[in-house]
Amino acid sequence: MCYNPFCIDGDSRVVSCARNPGEKRGGSMKPAAILDVGSSKVVCLCGSMVDKDGIVVHGAGISAYAGFRDGAFLDKQSLHNAVVDCVHKTEQESRLRIRDVALTVPASFARLELCDATIALGSSRLVESGDVDRLIHLSLQKAKKEEGWTLMHSTPVFFMVDGVSSTEMPDGVTAEEVSALVSHMFVRDEFIRTIQDALDDLGVEISMCVSAQLGEAVMLIPDNERVRPAVLIDIGYMQTDIAVVENAALTGLSTLPVGGYQFASDLSFGLDVPMEAAEQAKRRFVFSLDYRDKTEVLRTAAGSKKVSHQAISYIIEARAGELAGMIRREMEKLGVNLDARPAVYVSGGGLLMMRGGLDFLRNALNLPLKRDMPWTPRLSSPNYCSAFGALDFVLKANSSPEESMAKQKDDRVAGLLEKIKNFFMK
């Protein structure tokens, strides 16, 4: 099994080593399944693409688990049970047997490296696909060889053709020299092994790995807004991931150890109530309301407790303000020019599930934040963005408009994949 698909996204051409390539059947392609491992839940989706852009979800499974923190799972048995449960639910609802899944990789288990490369073509001639492959492979050789990591995908950020910058694939262009900046995404081997151990009980294999942030960013942020660096802020339950995306590649990735859990934890400590009661208060909270002289009754196993709405507001807004400051500083560290007013999208359920959360963050950061989760008949809330982003990414990869061209180049791609595999086995 190969876990290092080689992707070229610049011209919508994506070649991967997924075990089951897409098939067109009656206007739709063969269903694909993804497994999205979040910081508090696991989501399995089975869907297919219709009419090029539409996605039909045949089945979905969602299971909560203990989560992960600082790049480590808090309870592997809890994760194991959640993976098995959500795949079973998806199979039952879709009435399809899932044999393999595309696995999303959270930022905590991913590593990003940007490397450039240049090739001289000698006398001026047409750039061929093989030249682009060689560019990407040369840039990969500059990446750090760290034990315990495997390549997920490599995506060109931009090309330089005889000194002229271009985001288009240079195939067929006449040039003497071609350069490229390439985004290489790696996945921690231990992450793959842990998930595969759970899937082994079901007879399911991992067909490919996809960066959760890349799939989500490409789905949410329009192409024209990714011509210059754009930002995706995913505020989850245990952490906040910040990704910088340019064209169809990630150029920056960072994680902050703050999410929806910390809001509830602060309430639990500050109000001296159990986490369950704190979660209830958090979910009912609305930013920017005048809570003077109002109280709320929190029900616990030991009875009821009356607390001041002002106290709840103070605790939540203090944590939200702190998170906003951390996000701003992290974006600046990643090289984002905030004065240029970049496109910034927000997803995840850690803050957006609280009413008024987006407006609070927008005002705190003084940036035109956007929330643009595509409408779906179900699971349309922002905490499912990464799952739908992965499904969208995989389905489009399998239904490339240049499918016939990809088939003709299978041998070339397979040879390159073998070179990449050998590179990491040295």
What is the predicted role of each segment?
Residues 35-41, 105-107, 232-239, 245-248, ...:
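A short acidic Gly-Thr/Ser loop motif
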Residues 1-41, 46-230, 274-276, 288-313, ...:
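Nucleotide/phosphate-binding catalytic cleft detector across ATP-hydrolyzing
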Residues 286-289, 339-360:
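Glycine-rich phosphate-binding loops at beta-strand->alpha-helix junctions
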Residues 129, 362-388:
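Conserved phosphate-binding/catalytic loops in two-lobed NTP-binding clefts
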Residues 50, 225-226, 247, 360-366:
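Short, solvent-exposed amphipathic alpha-helical segments in soluble enzyme
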Residues 35, 44, 103, 199, ...:
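Residue-level signature of catalytic and energy-coupling elements of molecular machines
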Residues 310-322:
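Glycine-rich phosphate-binding "P-loop"
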Residues 221-290:
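Acidic, glycine-rich loop-and-beta core segments that form the ion-binding/anion-interacting portion
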